[in-house]
Amino acid sequence: MSGAASRRVGFLVLCGLIAASVAPTASAQSANPSADDIVEALVPSGPRGLGMRSLRGIEETPGTETGPPSIDLYINFKLNSAELEPEALRTLRVLGQALQSPKLKESRILIVGHTDAKGSATYNQELSVRRANAVRSVLVGAFDIEADKLTAEGKGATQLKDSANPEDGINRRVEIRNVGAN
């Protein structure tokens, strides 16, 4: 292949990579939920007790409760730090807008920090708490979310999203849970 042809192929590959990076994809959309997506994920679907009936008369099967409504957000921090990366602020802006929704006005929100399994258990626990608190601070400071509505806690690497790959980045996340009315 001549030098010009090689450069042309390289240019076409580069154009394809650029086009792929700006084209919306399902994974990019799920990694960057809208405020409406977050609200929908956090709004309880109705009463969830054993033996309770829904409005349609369908009885829930005992033991099928899945816990409080929640959503995992991939909020990037600087390496081994609770300092937010610039793209994390975009995600927090969307989260802040969602938490201001009238549908979530009376909700108490639990912010749960998770890490991957790199590092010691003690270090990961402390880091996950600091990261959850960093998210809480931004929501209170920038979006006027009432501080008493938000609780931060860390789980370290105790609840891996992908336990088969404990050091994978998918395990580094912040979980947002609606834990009930204020």
Task: Describe the role of every protein-language-model region.
Residues M1-G67:
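N-terminal targeting leaders that direct proteins to extracytoplasmic destinations
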Residues L50-T61, A98, T115-N124:
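Short N-terminal helix-initiation segments at or just after the protein's N-terminus
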Residues T64-P69, K103-L104, D144, E167-I170:
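Extracellular/periplasmic catalytic domains that process cell-envelope and extracellular macromolecules
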Residues P68-N80:
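Acidic/histidine-rich, surface-exposed loop or edge segments in extracytoplasmic proteins
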Residues K78-V112, V140-G141, I176, G180-N182:
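Periplasmic peptidoglycan-binding/anchoring modules of Gram-negative envelope and division proteins
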Residues V112-N182:
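Periplasmic OmpA-like peptidoglycan-binding domain that tethers envelope proteins to the cell wall
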